[in-house]
């Protein structure tokens, strides 16, 4: 008992030291997410050649850290047309020098124009792999919970590998079992939809959109899928162990236009923490 009691003051001191450290870490994370939100809010997405059509940017769908890669802090946002996903933007602060990177990926069948102020920073002509039918999937169920179970079963049929830029070593990405976004747009024939993320740690590297679609009222809904890359590395996607899509290393592919392709990665500056406030603008 004496030994236990003599340990208690040391434990109290240790816990007392841990609390300010945890509070400081929370404050840093709050500052960083505020900065990432500010950066996202500076972007406006329109239809190509149609500045009057502005898509809505939502709150962060996912907050992530990728200690297996470079990102120390990041957030993923989604542009919407009504409830439908249009495009994705991830903003991250990366080690070792707090470089700020912006990744954009289109899920839209036609052209887009992403602007920061008056400058066009990304103008994809098309999305990734879009609206591919899943003819062998069972008809969409009537209930929400049953359809969610179906979407998860469909998503588990996909495997995504990520290839190291120098060694080509493969890493299989992990699928988050809960969609990061779920929606319906029945006036556009989409009964239900879920956006699934394939991740390293919890950093999305590939997105899979699974949708239950119905062409006519009253008919049984079928299923379709779309894919959007969220990594500059080479990636290969398989469905039931059969390769269906691959993308080359973004920085080694001379055939892909950096500004008009469906995916873009850009360094936008450096994050500098401001004491007692939000991070500075990228320098």
Tell me what each language-model feature is:
Residues 3-24:
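Bacterial Sec-dependent signal peptides at the C-terminal "C-region" and cleavage site
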Residues 19-52, 65, 92-186, 206-283:
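Polybasic, proline/glycine-rich intrinsically disordered low-complexity segments
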Residues 56-92, 179-206, 210:
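Exposed beta-strand-loop-beta-strand "reactive/processing" segments of non-cytosolic proteins
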């Amino acid at each position: 008992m004496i030994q236990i009691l003599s340990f208690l003051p040391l434990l109290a001191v240790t816990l007392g030291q841990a609390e300010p450290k945890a509070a400081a870490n929370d404050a840093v994370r709050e500052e960083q997410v505020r900065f990432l939100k500010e950066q996202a809010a500076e972007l406006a997405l329109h239809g190509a050649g149609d500045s009057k059509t502005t898509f809505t940017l939502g709150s962060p769908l996912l907050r992530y850290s990728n200690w297996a890669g470079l990102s120390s802090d990041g957030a993923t946002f989604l542009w919407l047309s009504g409830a439908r996903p249009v495009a994705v933007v991830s903003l991250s602060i990366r080690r070792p020098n707090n470089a700020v990177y912006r990744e954009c990926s289109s899920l839209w069948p036609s052209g887009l124009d992403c602007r920061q102020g008056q400058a066009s920073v990304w103008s994809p002509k098309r999305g990734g792999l879009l609206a591919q039918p899943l003819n062998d999937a069972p008809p969409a169920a009537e209930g929400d919970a049953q359809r969610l179970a179906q979407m998860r079963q469909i998503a588990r049929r996909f495997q995504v590998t990520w290839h190291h830029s120098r060694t080509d070593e493969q890493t299989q990405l992990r699928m988050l079992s809960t969609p990061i976004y779920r929606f319906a747009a029945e006036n556009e024939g989409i009964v239900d939809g879920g956006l699934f993320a394939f991740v390293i740690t919890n950093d999305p590297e590939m997105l899979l959109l699974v949708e239950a679609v119905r062409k006519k009222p009253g008919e049984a809904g079928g299923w379709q899928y779309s894919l959007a890359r969220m990594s500059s590395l080479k990636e290969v996607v398989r469905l039931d162990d059969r390769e269906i899509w691959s993308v080359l290393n973004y920085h080694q592919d001379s055939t892909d236009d950096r500004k008009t392709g469906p995916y873009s990665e850009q360094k936008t500056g450096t994050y500098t923490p401001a004491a007692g406030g939000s991070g500075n603008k990228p320098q």
